[in-house]
């Protein structure tokens, strides 16, 4: 018999790769009549237009820096966040806490352990980050976006399903074919903004009705990217951010982007093939994600950033747009999606208590 919970703390912060899954998990808990408190840092821009979210921004710092001044500064901020989280958790009295990775989740995770609140984790990537790997030793269980991450945990670990952001409207491009979406993650990716438009200018020579929806990120050169497409005669829309990302993905024939776990889950959901250029930092997490997506699942191809050129990308785009190649990749993704778990994080937690 599953135990029920009535209150949960979600420890989260950092980039969209951690925050978006946490917000998706929040929706799952809310549907089960569970009261949710978000503790972390950096969520404000993701919560615009969401007045009913219970969220407190608390200090956080990384204890992993090798530079003494940064290490001490990070430790001080971490302690400040920890004491703030202790107060919040004491007042809120949750049944469980769930950490979503990144050092921004540390204050609430540590406070939960101190208060003897049962701890669970959610791992978005194929290879876990430092925080989740370390604190899995204190956790009752880990819910994973991809089952391949399970080999890194000794505690109970299962693949769980998080709801995908529903499209706010269906998007159709009746006069365009093919449609390519370019997305560099929540932070954008300068190298993609520089290289991809120039490569696609050559692709248009074989695909005259090409349409590109390019998301440059918050610091991207919107005008510069638009100018390249305009000069090449490519139909396009360039934006800093896209709230209706699933609607755009559903309307696309191909996606070019980074290999964050969130976008890969969305691609699997809509079965759209991709060319992935994984971010070379973050301890190789995105490269592992990209290998899993392209080699194990068969959903596309990977180009390492050090090998990315206009010519290498042009060749891969033309290959990906070949009807037979595209159909094979879509079929592989459909098969992979059929095999994914539909157990919710809420259900996994209740079963594990």
From Swiss-Prot:
Catalytic reactions on record: di-trans,octa-cis-undecaprenyl diphospho-N-acetyl-alpha-D-muramoyl-L-alanyl-D-glutamyl-meso-2,6-diaminopimeloyl-D-alanyl-D-alanine + UDP-N-acetyl-alpha-D-glucosamine = di-trans,octa-cis-undecaprenyl diphospho-[N-acetyl-alpha-D-glucosaminyl-(1->4)]-N-acetyl-alpha-D-muramoyl-L-alanyl-D-glutamyl-meso-2,6-diaminopimeloyl-D-alanyl-D-alanine + UDP + H(+)
> Cystine bridges: which residues?
none
Please name the pathway.
Cell wall biogenesis; peptidoglycan biosynthesis
Q: Which Pfam families match?
A: Glyco_tran_28_C, Glyco_transf_28
Q: What is its EC number?
A: 2.4.1.227
What is this entry's stated membrane topology?
A: Peripheral membrane protein
Q: Which parts of the chain span the membrane according to its record?
A: none
Q: What is its main location?
A: membrane
Per the record, what is one GO cellular component?
A: plasma membrane
Q: Name one GO molecular function term.
A: UDP-N-acetyl-D-glucosamine:N-acetylmuramoyl-L-alanyl-D-glutamyl-meso-2,6-diaminopimelyl-D-alanyl-D-alanine-diphosphoundecaprenol 4-beta-N-acetylglucosaminlytransferase activity
Which key words are in the record? Answer: Cell cycle, Cell division, Cell inner membrane, Cell membrane, Cell shape, Cell wall biogenesis/degradation, Glycosyltransferase, Membrane, Peptidoglycan synthesis, Transferase
Q: Which GO terms describe its biological process?
A: carbohydrate metabolic process; cell division; cell wall organization; lipid glycosylation; peptidoglycan biosynthetic process; regulation of cell shape
Compartments it resides in: Cell inner membrane
Top EC category = transferase
Indicate which residues the UniProt annotation says bind UDP-N-acetyl-alpha-D-glucosamine. 15-17, 125, 165, 186, 286
Keyword Cell membrane assigned: yes
Is NAD tagged as a keyword? no
State the coiled-coil residue ranges.
none
The signal peptide stretch is: none
Name the PANTHER family for this protein: GLYCOSYLTRANSFERASE, UDP-N-ACETYLGLUCOSAMINE--N-ACETYLMURAMYL-(PENTAPEPTIDE) PYROPHOSPHORYL-UNDECAPRENOL N-ACETYLGLUCOSAMINE TRANSFERASE 1
> Tell me, what does this protein do in biology?
Cell wall formation. Catalyzes the transfer of a GlcNAc subunit on undecaprenyl-pyrophosphoryl-MurNAc-pentapeptide (lipid intermediate I) to form undecaprenyl-pyrophosphoryl-MurNAc-(pentapeptide)GlcNAc (lipid intermediate II).
Q: What does the similarity note say?
A: Belongs to the glycosyltransferase 28 family. MurG subfamily.
- Show the NCBIfam families listed in the entry: murG
HAMAP family linked:
MurG
Supply the name of the protein. Answer: UDP-N-acetylglucosamine--N-acetylmuramyl-(pentapeptide) pyrophosphoryl-undecaprenol N-acetylglucosamine transferase
Q: What is the lineage of its organism?
A: Bacteria, Pseudomonadati, Chlamydiota, Chlamydiia, Chlamydiales
Gene name, per UniProt, is murG
């Amino acid at each position: 018999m599953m135990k029920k919970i009535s209150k949960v703390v979600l420890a989260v912060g950092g980039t969209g790769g951690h925050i978006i899954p946490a917000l998706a998990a929040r929706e799952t808990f809310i549907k089960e009549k569970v009261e949710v408190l978000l503790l972390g840092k950096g969520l404000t821009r993701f919560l615009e237009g969401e007045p009913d979210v219970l969220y407190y921004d608390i200090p956080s710092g990384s204890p992993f820096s090798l530079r003494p001044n940064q290490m001490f500064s990070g430790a001080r901020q971490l302690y400040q966040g920890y004491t703030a989280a202790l107060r919040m958790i004491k007042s809120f009295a949750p049944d469980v806490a769930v950490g979503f990775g990144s050092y921004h989740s540390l204050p609430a995770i540590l406070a939960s352990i101190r208060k003897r609140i049962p701890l669970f984790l959610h791992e978005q990537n194929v290879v876990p980050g430092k925080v989740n790997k370390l604190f899995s030793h204190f956790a009752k269980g880990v819910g994973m976006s991809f089952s391949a991450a399970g080999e890194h945990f000794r505690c109970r670990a299962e693949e769980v399903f998080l709801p995908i952001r529903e499209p706010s409207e269906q998007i159709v491009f009746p006069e365009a074919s093919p449609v390519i979406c370019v997305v560099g993650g929540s932070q954008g990716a300068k190298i993609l903004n520089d290289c991809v438009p120039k490569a696609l200018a050559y692709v248009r020579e074989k695909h005259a009705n090409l349409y590109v929806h390019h998301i440059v990120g918050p610091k991207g050169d919107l005008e510069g990217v638009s100018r390249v497409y305009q000069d090449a005669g490519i139909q396009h829309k360039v934006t800093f951010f896209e709230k209706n990302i699933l609607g755009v993905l559903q309307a696309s024939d191909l996606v070019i982007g980074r290999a964050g776990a969130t976008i890969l889950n969305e691609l699997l959901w809509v079965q759209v093939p991709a060319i992935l250029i994984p971010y070379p930092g973050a301890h190789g997490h995105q490269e592992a994600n990209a290998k899993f997506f392209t080699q194990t699942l068969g959903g596309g191809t990977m180009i390492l950033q050090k090998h990315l050129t206009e010519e290498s990308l042009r060749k891969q785009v033309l290959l990906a747009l070949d009807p037979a190649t595209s159909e094979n990749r879509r079929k592989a993704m459909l098969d992979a999606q059929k095999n994914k778990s539909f157990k919710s994080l809420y259900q996994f937690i209740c079963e594990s208590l």
